[in-house]
């Protein structure tokens, strides 16, 4: 019970509330963590309906605003996550930074700047087997083209520090968005 009390008082910032980030938000919020800031710039589109929390009934709406209604204690920030925004934003009051960014440049910048308090994820698109989700060093990931791009860019920029990422080792299962042929 002491662990739960300590955990629920954690202050988190979640960057990206798409397919991975929205489910992370739902899981964290429903376990009692309420002090969560969510950051995203996107609006819900029809293609989000089968893979993003909060999308049903909210097509065309700003994601963080719709999620604020679903999870009333979160703090929404509607802004595009860029390297410049990362440089300007004060992350010091957060215990953890949850990285669900799906854009290489800001993701790499965030990792380089804040890798000691980051929990970084890859995407879940085209994957269906939850038993393939792993939490390992970014340098040991495989079968994930997005994380490979991140590794390649980090290496190109001389970043060699160790940190773990959440990713799926499953090979992508479908040819296009929403198609499991």
Regions found by a protein language model. Give the residues of each.
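Adenine nucleotide-associated cytosolic modules
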Residues: 1-181
